[in-house]
From Swiss-Prot:
Family: Belongs to the MurB family.
Lineage: superkingdom: Bacteria
Predominant localisation class: cytoplasm
Residues annotated as catalytic: R177, S258 (proton donor), E358
Pathway(s) per entry: Cell wall biogenesis; peptidoglycan biosynthesis
Record organism: Mycobacterium ulcerans (strain Agy99)
GO biological process terms held by the UniProt record: cell division; cell wall organization; peptidoglycan biosynthetic process; regulation of cell shape
Family annotation (PROSITE patterns): FAD_PCMH
EC number, as in UniProt: 1.3.1.98
Function as written in the Swiss-Prot or TrEMBL entry: Cell wall formation.
Protein's name in the database: UDP-N-acetylenolpyruvoylglucosamine reductase
């Protein structure tokens, strides 16, 4: 089917029919949406979703998927009659050390805006693809920092009532790569993020540096604070080496980033693993136990960079970073799920640890 623009039907939003979703996601897989509604303002997001949710409750609308950057989602190939609401509101407001970013804002643009204003706290999260609205959903984190460290509140649309309100961070149940906002299947989200507020450091210093690879790159000690722009540059260099900065010409970046989260296990499981391998197992303290490095587990279980090594395979592990499942061109969501299951099951068979996916899976499952 060819894409057909049909004009504006909902709250002034842009509407098109028969739109391939693959080009709108960083993994570049997905079905053709029956309807794509692009919302450029918060009022449009609210108006469109209220209308569509009313229709769905009356049985007059098929499944509705809400997304923005498409960087942390795998959408099943066979989803039919799908209506997609693309959140594209992108205003950023700075008031002293408080920064409010609308949900559709490109995340890295938020980071840049804060650094340009001399605010620290987000520099370690540079280069992460996707939108500002996705960051609280999975409590985005990298290089020793999580967004929950600086989020004060989130503006939400409650889809059951249509109400819009600011919800304090304390009510969002933030955890490792999760929040109360992620506790639902992708087509049944009870609330949609409209805007996020951050409280940042106006002293001109970065967040405390805790990640060994980053402190080494900067020649600093753990716990020290750096100049935010210098920290950003170091983070981008590290991410680029791992294929974690989007580049249309580099298939290693055609991914959702790390596909599996680092597992948190009981101390005795870590001790068993260390005894089993006879190696120094990378690990970090976690509130509920010991956090292991999923990439290390993959490689020790036989799933090294570039697995399965077949140059004709449409989906392979990145040649730069084993945790990234990449589309080498022409892959489908089914191809991604096959490789993900192979890796998950292989790690479980070797180590007795079941890895969990980091992206939101819509219309597909491991």
């Amino acid at each position: 089917m060819k894409r057909r623009d049909v004009g504006s039907l909902f709250a002034g939003a842009r509407v098109a029919e028969s739109v391939p979703l693959a080009p709108l996601t960083t993994l570049r897989v997905g079905p053709v949406a029956r309807t794509l509604v692009t919302c450029d303002t918060t009022d449009q997001v609210v108006g469109v979703l209220r209308e569509l949710d009313d229709r769905a409750r009356n049985g007059d609308c098929g499944p509705v998927l809400v997304f923005a950057g498409g960087s942390n989602v795998v959408i099943g190939d066979a989803l039919a009659d799908l209506t997609v609401v693309r959140v594209a509101n992108d205003r950023v407001t700075v008031d002293g050390n408080l920064v409010r970013a609308e949900a559709g804002t490109v995340w890295d643009e938020v980071v840049v805006a804060t650094i340009e204003r001399g605010l620290g706290g987000l520099e370690c999260l540079s280069g992460i693809p996707g939108s500002a609205g996705a960051t609280p959903v999975q409590n985005v984190g990298a290089y020793g920092v999580e967004v929950s460290d600086v989020i004060t509140r989130v503006r939400l649309l409650d889809r059951s009532t249509g109400d819009v309100s600011w919800v304090p961070a304390a009510d969002l149940s933030f955890g490792y790569r999760t929040s109360v906002l992620k506790q639902a299947e992708g087509l049944a989200l009870p609330a949609v993020v409209l805007e996020v507020e951050f409280a940042l450091d106006a002293s001109g210093r970065s967040a405390p540096l805790r990640y060994g690879e980053l402190t080494a790159a900067l020649g600093m000690n753990s716990g020290e604070r750096g100049e935010p722009r210098a920290v950003r540059d170091a983070v981008l260099a590290l991410r680029t080496r791992k294929g974690m900065v989007l580049d249309a010409a580099d298939h290693d970046t055609w991914s959702v980033g790390s596909f599996f989260t680092n597992p948190v296990v009981a101390p005795e499981i870590y001790e068993r693993l260390a005894a089993q391998t006879g190696e120094s197992v990378p690990h970090y303290p976690a509130p509920d136990g010991v956090k292991l490095a999923a990439g290390w587990l993959l490689e020790r279980a036989g799933f090294g960079k570039g697995y399965p090594g077949d140059p004709h395979a449409r989906c392979r592990l990145s040649s730069k970073h084993a945790l990234a499942l990449t589309n080498r061109g022409g892959a489908t969501a089914a191809d991604v799920m096959v490789l993900a299951r192979t890796v998950r099951d292989g790690v479980r068979d070797v180590f007795g640890i079941t890895l969990k996916p980091e992206p939101v899976l819509v219309g597909c499952a491991l």
